[in-house]
Every structure is written in C-alpha cells, then in structure tokens.
C-alpha cells in the first residue's frame, strides 16, 4: 500500500475520515502468481487483444519510462470497484452474508425508521412485482413494515448480533427469518428499480447503522473471503429467498433472486501492479460503502492502492454509524458525485489534474470516465448495458474496427475506449469483447443503444456529439469538460 498516498489524503480530510483503515489493517501483499511487470502485460490470452495493446501503449506513453513523464505531477488511474475491479458486486454479496447470519446492530424499535431513510414520501406507496408467480404487486411501505416486524421477533429470540451467527436449523425453520431475508433483499431490488440512484445507493449502507467502521470492515472482509473462495461461497450461481405462505404479513409472500460469487482476477491484480510499477498511481472510486471496499482491497490483496473514496455515513458521538450520508466529506460516489469527489478529494493531490485512466462498467461511472480532459484511456467491462455505459461501449467498438490506437485518439483530443469481455459463469476474463453473463449460455455483446452510437460514428459524428446526443444523464457536464 502506498503510504505516501494515504498520508497526503489524510492531510486534506481529517484522520477519522474515509481513508483511515480499520484497526485490523495490515500492509497489502500481492498474490505470488502476479509477477512484477514493467511496460508489458502477462496473461495475454485472457485480455482481449485490443485491450492488451491499448493498456501496454498507455503504460509506454504515460508511464515513468516515457521521456515525457514528469514525476512532479504523477498520472493516476481511477477504478470503479463493483463489476470493474471485481467480477460481480461485493456489497450485494455482503447483503446476503448479513441476511443469512442476521448481522445487524440496529435496535428493533429503530429498524423501520432506518429502512424508511431517504425514501420520498410519494414513493412509499410505489409498487413492484412480488415475483412469486402470482403476478401481484407489493407496496414498498408494506414490505418495510413486514421486515421491521420480522426483525423484532428475530431480535427478541437473540438471533441478531453485530458479527452475525451461523444459521441454526431452528433459525432456518422460522417463518420470520425466511420472510425477513426475502423482504429485505426484495426491498433492495425494488428501491433500486423504482427510485433514483441517489435514494437507492445509500439505502443499503444504512444497514450498517449502529456498527463502528471496524465492525463493518471485519464483517465485510469475512464475507469477501468466503464468497471469494471457490471451495466455499464462490459458486457462480444464483440463489433466491422466498417468503413463507404460513405467515400473515401486509405484503404477502415475495421471491427474489441473488448472485453467489465475487473475485478480483489475476489480470486485474496485475493491472494495478503494472500501473504502480510504471509510476502511475491507482485510486478506487466506488458506490459501495467505504469500509466494505477497504476490506475488499485487503481481502483480495490488491496492490498499490493509493486511496479509496466511497459511500460514507456519519458517525454518532460513540463512533458508530447513523443512517445519514456524510456530505461533509464528499458527494455520493455515484454518477455526477464520482466526478465531483475526484475534483474535491483526488485531483488536488495532482495539481488539479483528472485521471489519465478510468475503469468502469455502468451508468454510475459514465460521468467520471468521460468528463475529464486529462483522461487518455477508458477501460470498460462489457455487461451489455442499456444505459449511458452503452455509449462508451459503442465508441470502443467503433475505434477498434477503425484501428484507432491510443496515439491517434489522443492526438485527436479523444480518449481511447477499450471494451473487455468476461465469463461470469466461472469468474474469468477472456480474449473477447463479449461477455457471458451469469447463468446465461449465449454471450452478450452490444445493446441497441451501443449499436446506435456506433452507427452514428460511422456516419461521421464526433465522439463529443454522440455522447451529447445519446446520454440520459442530465447532470453530465459534457465530454472532456472538467
């Protein structure tokens, strides 16, 4: 871990801020299988060949072996975490760990209040499918009421603990236990699909209310190690929760599915290490909760991380999280907030410069990956997105098919966009720009929106114009405007 990077940042934000690791922090050690690299990538069969070439060219052109390198203002890379640094989502996986083990520190009388946090009143009666085969729809407020009532029963039985417990046969047979898990995970999906991301992204972090940062870190690290281990929870399968039919509730039964498995591949570990070995700093900018991300950096031994900015809630006087986002530190680290957080927290350490490399996968990363003038290269993990991430996927394929390399793109004032595919059924990269999504048999490529962007570029539109004409994010400041 680059201690200078941490010290520089702590000088800007107080020592109790998002970058003070949990007490259990130890220096990151790199997996033995990841070699020391200078200006070249190993594992070439597992990187898409155009991606491999682009990254190598980036290191050669902007790393410390380049004659143009100035170490007084080091270039830096900014990585999203979920579905970018990692395959699949660490916080969604932690939610399953929490629910199965009832790892909460919320008082039973406060649970309903916590679950209501941030949800606009006019959205409480919003409905979402129960997905139990009945075709019925369920009100958000009814599911919240049920989950809070279930929690009181489970808490009274002594099954709720901060660290969580291995579920017993008695717990598994409990109707309230079954319903609580189903309603909580259903709410996560329902809120995410029916409300703005500024509501849904922080909502799941309020589950840590009552915990200290170190308690969240330790809980998350245990989850990461379990679901990142192919002999344990890393099954690359889908599971589901279903409410029982023999429990009287306001919402009635619901069913919800979830994914099992997370990893950080040897190729991604290598990329972090390669960048650092060539004088390029690396940062994480994530919409997951900050302690959850810090724990993942350690659990997966990600080398050379200079800093983490992520979702952070306020602490009470006893040092425990409350259900309130800490805007005093920075904006929510999603969408526009990822860019403003770079401007507030990271760029001042680099004389105001933006990231030279951006790594992303989805709508929440679109702003920071396209708005900064200093960004030379954008690495996109293909999930066949239909949101604004489809725009950059379409640009990447246009540049690839027209043999536009890094030097040419940068000379034209553009970033080079690179599209990397992967196999989510076994947690690996492969030499393809297509992705096999979890549970699917056929690969996914470009969404209709991405194909539209590629077509418009073929007709002669500029990258700036296709972004402006196709983006749905009204807060996007424009291509290379920061």
What does each of the following model-derived ranges do?
Residues 80-81, 86-89, 166-167, 365:
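N-terminal low-complexity, Ser/Thr- and acidic-residue-enriched intrinsically disordered segments
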Residues 5, 9-81, 89-128, 132, ...:
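Non-catalytic pre-domain segments flanking phosphatase-related domains
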Residues 91, 98-100, 105-255:
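A metal-dependent, Asp-based hydrolase signature
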Residues 1-3:
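Short amphipathic, positively biased membrane-proximal segments
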């Amino acid at each position: 871990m680059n201690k200078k990077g941490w010290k520089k940042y702590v000088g800007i934000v107080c020592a109790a801020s998002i970058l003070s690791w949990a007490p259990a922090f130890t220096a990151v050690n790199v997996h033995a299988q990841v070699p020391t690299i200078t200006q070249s990538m190993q594992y070439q069969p597992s990187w898409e060949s155009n991606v491999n070439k682009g990254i190598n060219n980036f290191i050669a052109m902007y790393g410390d072996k380049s004659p143009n390198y100035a170490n007084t203002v080091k270039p830096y890379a900014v990585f999203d975490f979920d579905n970018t640094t990692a395959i699949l989502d660490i916080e969604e996986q932690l939610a399953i760990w929490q629910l199965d083990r009832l790892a909460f520190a919320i008082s039973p009388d406060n649970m309903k209040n916590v679950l209501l946090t941030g949800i606009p009143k006019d959205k409480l009666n919003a409905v979402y499918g129960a997905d139990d085969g009945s075709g019925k729809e369920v009100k958000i407020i009814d599911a919240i009421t049920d989950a809070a009532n279930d929690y009181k029963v489970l808490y009274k039985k002594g099954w709720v603990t901060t660290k969580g417990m291995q579920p017993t046969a008695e717990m598994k047979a409990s109707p309230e236990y079954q319903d609580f898990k189903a309603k909580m995970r259903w709410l996560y999906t329902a809120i995410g699909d029916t409300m703005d991301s500024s509501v849904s992204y922080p909502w799941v972090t309020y589950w840590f209310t009552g915990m200290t940062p170190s308690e969240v870190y330790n809980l998350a690290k245990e989850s990461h190690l379990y679901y990142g281990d192919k002999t344990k929870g890393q099954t690359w399968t889908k599971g589901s929760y279903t409410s029982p039919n023999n429990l009287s509730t306001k919402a009635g039964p619901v069913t919800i599915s979830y994914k099992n498995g997370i990893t950080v591949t040897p190729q991604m570990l290598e990329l972090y290490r390669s960048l650092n070995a060539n004088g390029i700093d690396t940062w994480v900018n994530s919409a997951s909760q900050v302690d959850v991300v810090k724990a993942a950096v350690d659990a997966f031994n990600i080398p050379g991380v200079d800093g983490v900015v992520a979702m952070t809630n306020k602490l009470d006087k006893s040092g425990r999280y409350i259900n309130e986002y800490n805007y005093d530190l920075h904006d929510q680290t999603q969408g526009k907030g990822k860019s403003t957080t770079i401007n507030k927290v990271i760029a001042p350490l680099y004389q105001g410069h933006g990231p030279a490399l951006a790594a992303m996968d989805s709508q929440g990363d679109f702003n920071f990956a396209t708005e900064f003038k200093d960004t030379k290269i954008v690495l996109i993990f293909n999930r066949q997105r239909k949101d604004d991430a489809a725009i950059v996927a379409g640009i990447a394929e246009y540049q690839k098919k027209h043999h536009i390399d890094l030097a040419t793109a940068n000379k034209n004032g553009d970033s080079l966009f690179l599209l990397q595919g992967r196999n989510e059924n076994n947690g690996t990269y492969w030499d393809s720009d297509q992705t096999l999504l979890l549970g699917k048999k056929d690969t996914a490529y470009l969404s209709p929106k991405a194909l539209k962007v590629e077509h418009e570029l073929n007709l002669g539109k500029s990258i700036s114009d296709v972004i402006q004409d196709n983006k749905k994010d009204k807060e996007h400041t424009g291509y290379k405007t920061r």
